[in-house]
C-alpha cells in the first residue's frame, strides 16, 4: 500500500554488488601499450601509489560522480567494498569513521541505495606476512574493526536506503583467527570476500594451507546466504557445488574478469 505506482512498463533497477569507488578515478592509468606486460599485480602497484594522495574530500567527490554514472546506467543500488579507512601512512583520522562517512554522504547526495561494506584488512599475505607500505591505509585490528562496524550500523538506522554489512578483503589479508572472532561478534548483515580471483592467490593458498581458497573457506566457516564470494573465478567442480548448495552468492565482475 505504500509502494509508488508508476504508469506504463517498468524495468527494475540493477544492483551493483561490488564497487571500489575511489578506483573510478584511476581509469586509464594502468594499461600501457607497446608490449608492456600488464597484470593484476602491476595494476595493484599503481593503485597503491594512486591512493596515497587521496583525501576524504577526494573520495567523496569521486564516489558521488561514480554513483551518478551508475544511476544514469540503470544501477539503483550499490555494494561499496570499502577498505580505504585511514590517512596517508596509516594515520587514523580524528574521526575513525571519516572515510565511511564520505561514502554515506556521496550516496545521500546522489540518491543511490547503499550497502556499505567496511573491509577488514590486517596483513600483507598468507601466514601473517607484514603489510606493504601501500596497504597501511587499509589496516585494522579486531577491536577497532568491530567498533567501526558497530558504529556504522548504528548510523545507518537514520539514513534512508542505507545499510551496513562487512567484508573480509581476502584470505591472504585476514588471519583465520581474526575471521572467526569477527564473525562471532557481528552476527547479522551481509558478508563479502574477494576469493579465488587470481591463480597466484590459489597457488599461495595451497602452499599455506594445502587447500584451495574456496575449499578452505567452506571447511573453516559456515557459509550461508549472508555471504557473497566476489570473483570466485578459479574453482574446482567440488568447490562450485559447495557454493551452489550453500545459498551464498558468487559476485561476478564482468568488466574486470573479461
Report each predicted region and the residues it spans.
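Histidine-rich, glycine-flanked metal-binding segment
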Residues: 1-12, 152
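Histidine-centered catalytic micro-motifs
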Residues: 12-24, 190-199
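Divalent metal-coordination and catalytic microenvironments
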Residues: 18, 74, 78, 107, ...
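Short, solvent-exposed beta-strand-terminating loops
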Residues: 19-34, 115-125
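Alpha-helical scaffold segments that flank or form the walls of functional sites
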Residues: 28-113, 143-159
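A structural motif
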Residues: 75, 112, 188, 247-248
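Metal-coordinating catalytic core of metallo-dependent amide/deamination hydrolases
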Residues: 86-233
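Active-site-adjacent C-terminal substructures of enzyme catalytic domains
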Residues: 219-258
Amino acid at each position: 500500500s505504500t509502494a509508488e505506482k508508476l504508469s506504463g512498463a517498468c524495468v527494475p533497477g540493477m544492483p551493483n554488488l561490488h564497487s571500489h569507488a575511489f578506483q573510478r578515478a584511476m581509469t586509464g592509468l594502468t594499461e600501457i601499450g607497446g608490449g608492456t606486460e600488464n597484470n593484476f599485480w602491476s595494476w595493484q602497484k599503481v593503485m597503491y601509489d594512486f591512493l596515497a594522495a587521496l583525501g576524504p574530500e577526494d573520495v567523496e567527490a569521486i564516489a558521488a560522480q561514480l554513483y551518478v554514472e551508475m544511476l544514469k546506467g540503470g544501477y539503483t543500488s550499490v555494494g561499496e567494498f570499502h577498505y580505504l579507512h585511514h590517512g596517508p601512512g596509516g594515520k587514523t583520522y580524528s574521526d575513525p569513521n571519516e572515510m565511511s562517512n564520505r561514502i554515506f554522504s556521496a550516496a545521500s547526495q546522489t540518491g543511490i541505495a547503499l550497502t556499505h561494506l567496511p573491509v577488514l584488512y590486517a596483513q600483507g599475505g598468507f601466514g601473517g606476512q607484514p603489510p606493504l607500505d601501500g596497504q597501511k591505509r587499509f589496516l585494522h585490528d579486531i577491536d577497532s574493526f568491530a567498533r567501526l562496524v558497530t558504529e556504522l550500523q548504528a548510523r545507518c538506522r537514520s539514513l534512508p536506503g542505507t545499510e551496513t554489512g562487512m567484508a573480509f578483503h581476502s584470505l591472504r589479508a585476514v588471519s583465520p583467527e581474526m575471521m572467526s572472532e569477527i564473525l562471532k561478534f557481528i552476527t547479522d548483515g551481509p558478508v563479502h570476500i574477494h576469493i579465488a580471483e587470481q591463480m597466484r592467490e590459489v597457488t599461495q593458498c595451497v602452499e599455506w594451507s594445502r587447500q584451495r581458497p574456496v575449499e578452505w573457506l567452506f571447511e573453516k566457516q559456515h557459509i550461508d546466504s549472508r555471504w557473497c564470494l566476489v570473483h570466485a573465478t578459479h574453482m574446482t567442480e567440488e568447490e562450485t557445488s559447495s557454493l551452489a548448495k550453500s545459498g551464498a552468492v558468487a559476485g561476478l565482475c564482468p568488466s574486470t574478469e573479461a
